[in-house]
């Protein structure tokens, strides 16, 4: 089943117009799955460094050379990269609108979780006064 996360990753690799429009607003923390987050971070690093979209091959090479991942992690992340398929028929406006909603929903969710962590006293760096009133 295709998810918005996988669709986003696929389009970030194969659709330059989409990538230029949405990449500045997407954060790694929006990806709940660690393997998808790693793929996103590699795409983001590549675009920042080369001002171009990465190919699946360049992503595979970059991921394979990471020293912070064990072999099992690398294998899972490379599987995600291999499964990325750009959908040439996807409606651009729908794609951007759906991605914007995904980003907003994840940002709100993450803020709520962070607030609960602070209220529960599990955040050692911030107390309840860190939550805006």
Where are the model-predicted features located?
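Noncatalytic partner-interaction/assembly domains of nucleic-acid and motor enzyme complexes
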Residues: 1-102
């Amino acid at each position: 089943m295709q998810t918005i996360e996988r669709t986003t990753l696929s389009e970030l690799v194969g659709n330059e117009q989409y990538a230029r429009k949405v990449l500045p607003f997407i954060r790694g923390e929006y990806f709940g799955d660690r393997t998808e987050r790693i793929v996103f971070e590699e795409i983001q690093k590549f675009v920042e460094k080369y001002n171009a979209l990465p190919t699946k091959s360049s992503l595979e090479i970059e991921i394979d050379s990471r020293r912070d991942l064990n072999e099992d992690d690398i294998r899972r992340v490379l599987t995600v990269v291999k499964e990325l398929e750009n959908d040439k028929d996807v409606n651009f406006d729908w794609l951007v609108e759906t991605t914007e909603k995904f980003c907003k929903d994840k940002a709100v969710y993450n803020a709520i979780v962070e607030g609960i962590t602070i209220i529960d006293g599990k955040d050692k760096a911030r107390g309840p006064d860190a939550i805006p009133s």
